[in-house]
């Protein structure tokens, strides 16, 4: 595509692209009436050879530049690939750290739940004692009010 764009541009500049040999010789003869058509023809052929060399050099320059661009793009893709690999490793590392932290939090939560359950059971025992004591005190008060000996 780049070559095509360049060729369109060269079509408006290079003599061999602007004119056929006959057109050039005719134009040359009309512009310089005392000129020889053989000289005009040789001059056109010289232009044609020069134009061809220019086109070849430009093609080569474009191809070289495109090749350099491809190499650079491939290098960047490799760097991006390496970068993606590094990012992937970092993500795995972060995932591992988060998993370890989550495991630690689960262990701490289990420990707290165990302590809370133990505390609840102790409270339950105390509550049973309190209820029993309350019942005994209530009976004692009732007995005292009725003047009955407590048991």
From Swiss-Prot:
GO cellular-component term (any): kinetochore
The protein, known as: Inner kinetochore subunit NKP2
UniProt-annotated location(s): Nucleus; Chromosome, Centromere, Kinetochore
GO annotation terms (biological process): cell division; meiotic cell cycle
Sorted UniProt keywords: Cell cycle, Cell division, Centromere, Chromosome, Coiled coil, Kinetochore, Meiosis, Mitosis, Nucleus
Subunit comment: Component of the inner kinetochore constitutive centromere-associated network (CCAN) (also known as central kinetochore CTF19 complex in yeast). NKP2 interacts directly with OKP1 and AME1.
Role, per record: Component of the kinetochore, a multiprotein complex that assembles on centromeric DNA and attaches chromosomes to spindle microtubules, mediating chromosome segregation and sister chromatid segregation during meiosis and mitosis. Component of the inner kinetochore constitutive centromere-associated network (CCAN), which serves as a structural platform for outer kinetochore assembly.
Similarity-based family: Belongs to the NKP2 family.
Broad class of the protein's primary localization: nucleus
Recorded coiled-coil stretches: 44-64, 102-122
Gene: NKP2
């Amino acid at each position: 595509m780049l070559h095509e764009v360049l060729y369109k541009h060269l079509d408006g500049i290079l003599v061999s692209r602007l004119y056929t040999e006959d057109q050039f010789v005719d134009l040359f003869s009309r512009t310089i009436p005392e000129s020889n058509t053989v000289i005009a023809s040789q001059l056109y052929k010289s232009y044609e050879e020069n134009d061809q060399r220019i086109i070849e050099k430009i093609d080569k320059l474009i191809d070289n530049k495109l090749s350099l661009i491809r190499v650079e793009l491939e290098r960047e893709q490799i760097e991006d690939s390496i970068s993606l690999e590094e990012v992937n490793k970092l993500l795995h590392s972060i995932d591992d750290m988060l998993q370890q932290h989550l495991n630690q939090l689960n262990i701490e939560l289990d420990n707290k739940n165990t302590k809370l359950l133990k505390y609840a059971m102790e409270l339950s025992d105390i509550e049973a004692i309190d209820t029993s004591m309350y019942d005994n005190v209530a009976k004692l008060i009732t007995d005292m009010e009725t003047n009955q000996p407590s048991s």
